[in-house]
Amino acid sequence: MSSLHKSRIADFQDVLKEPSIVLEKLRELSFSGIPCEGGLRCLCWKILLNYLPLERASWTSILAKQRGLYSQFLREMIIQPGIAKANMGVFREDVTFEDHPLNPNPDSRWNTYFKDNEVLLQIDKDVRRLCPDISFFQRATEYPCLLILDPQNEFETLRKRVEQTTLKSQTVARNRSGVTNMSSPHKNSAPSALNEYEVLPNGCEAHWEVVERILFIYAKLNPGIAYVQGMNEIVGPLYYTFATDPNSEWKEHAEADTFFCFTNLMAEIRDNFIKSLDDSQCGITYKMEKVYSTLKDKDVELYLKLQEQSIKPQFFAFRWLTLLLSQEFLLPDVIRIWDSLFADGNRFDFLLLVCCAMLILIREQLLEGDFTVNMRLLQDYPITDVCQILQKAKELQDSK
């Protein structure tokens, strides 16, 4: 470890040990990258994402309150309607007479359960493929959710819900005449999503299953947006960072902490995921056009070239902006970019500058290339040095 790196760690420690943390100092340090040693990044992100307040004295009580609240969400939302949950005040006889799976009432708990399953299956499909370049999300967590997995309780795991729902959809088929046929899943040669990764034994769960639970609870609490494909790519780096914290106490509560940080982050970017807002000033279309207007201001020659080739920002910037560049770089580089994004007071204005910098840094290739070549460049970005990109974005910011 270089003396410069040791000095940076000491600077962070000095800022973080103050009874009242000075946010501007923390932002200034974090913008240039947060050391991963000693759990510094995890702590800084929790402050920068407004999960932890600046007053250190209140951390213990707030963490206890929020983690307790998350446990309550688990109790309330990961249950199967129609099964007695004595410790939640739901008894079998109450459910049997008032509700049943064929109840047509839209407010029926069974109707809600089936709709939730549709959302759950989409989440399940997406989280199984999270960060395929590393094995982390397929490995077992050291801290499985005992509230869900303990055989002494009556909670149903999301894993079982997915298995049961998928099994029914695979084995029951209706032909064009409307006749329902039962088929054995063993005769189906198509690979099942459930078999894509080895299923862990009872009492264990993979990291992707934890992410699945976070997203499912978020969808339940936010029915207006629920779950949109791509949210998994936002929560993934957050959870990875918190679940690899060297401090076991922090790591044990990675799920709850990730949920609240993800919720706070989504409060800032959720408009990107709402299609009805695409063309509004807070929507994704406006932001994509802002990338091009910024490029026009900084490099008009390159802007005109892209316009001439009819390369619209929707062709590449939609993914860049919506997913906070999480699909353009390897996970460690994404995390480094997010250090700067989270630290910047106008963080998503800075994201626009990062996107603009990415274009300018490959300007020579773009000016020489035709439509096909340039689309390939933009959809499979060639530069891997994210520090170079961030430096260029900072130059653009300072030159305003």
UniProtKB/Swiss-Prot annotation:
Pfam families xref list: RabGAP-TBC
Keyword Membrane attached: yes
InterPro entries, per database record: Rab-GAP-TBC_dom, Rab-GAP_TBC_sf
Source domain of life: Eukaryota
GO CC terms: cytosol; membrane
Transmembrane helix among keywords: no
Tissue expression notes: Expressed in adipocytes.
SUPFAM superfamilies named in the record: Ypt/Rab-GAP domain of gyp1p
Molecular function per GO: GTPase activator activity; small GTPase binding
Major subcellular site: membrane
Keyword terms: Cytoplasm, GTPase activation, Membrane
Intracellular or extracellular location(s): Membrane; Cytoplasm
Gene Ontology biological process: intracellular protein transport
Residue ranges of domain Rab-GAP TBC in the record: 35-345
Disulfide-bonded cysteines: none
Function per UniProt: Acts as a GTPase-activating protein for RAB35. Together with RAB35 may be involved in regulation of insulin-induced glucose transporter SLC2A4/GLUT4 translocation to the plasma membrane in adipocytes.
Assembly and binders: Interacts with RAB1A and RAB10; in a GTP-dependent manner.
The protein, known as: TBC1 domain family member 13
Native organism: Mus musculus
